[in-house]
């Protein structure tokens, strides 16, 4: 799978699992993404896909590296519709 394809899949999963905030942008907690069965099957390296999406300014989140458990409550915010 190529990175662009995985980023597009990530956007679809954020739309499926996320909710709109006060700013009108969709977001989902990292822990929700990480523990979702469909996401677990789709992404071999969820953190790497998130990092690639952040670099392309498709999503944003606090920090550089997200770890299961430690960062479960970090919001992953979708910047593009």
Curated annotation (Swiss-Prot):
What superkingdom heads the lineage?
A: Eukaryota
Q: Which family does it belong to?
A: Belongs to the costars family.
Q: What is this protein called?
A: Costars family protein ABRACL
Question: Can you name the source organism?
Answer: Xenopus tropicalis
């Amino acid at each position: 799978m190529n990175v662009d394809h995985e980023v597009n899949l990530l956007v679809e999963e954020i739309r499926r699992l996320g909710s709109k905030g006060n700013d009108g942008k969709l977001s989902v907690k990292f822990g929700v993404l990480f523990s979702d069965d469909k996401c677990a099957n789709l992404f071999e390296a969820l953190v790497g896909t998130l990092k690639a999406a952040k670099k392309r300014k498709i999503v944003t989140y606090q920090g550089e590296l997200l770890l299961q458990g430690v960062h479960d409550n970090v919001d992953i915010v979708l910047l593009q519709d």
